[in-house]
């Protein structure tokens, strides 16, 4: 996998993990935005994998859902390994984005 595809995949998996932790905490996007200090618009873009999140913002989100960064990275790593089984829609989204980018 080349670096661009890996970056797209990672952004999508991070977004899915944030969304999953948000749902596990039983809070909505607005509540997570308030708890973390991240705008709702930015949160939507992060959760959908549209942007590469910076470490400071990611840390704010992770702490807001009651996790520590090492725990979060373990979750991300596990999901990267299992993505094909657990996140087929992410795999499709990544494939679609790669196809679109290759047409440009």
Which functions belong to the PLM regions below?
Residues 73-104:
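Short, charged recognition helix plus adjacent turn
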Residues 1-24:
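A short, Lys/Arg-rich alpha-helix, primarily the initiator
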Residues 36-51:
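Recognition helix of helix-turn-helix/homeodomain-like DNA-binding domains
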Residues 54-71:
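DNA major-groove recognition helix of helix-turn-helix/homeodomain DNA-binding modules
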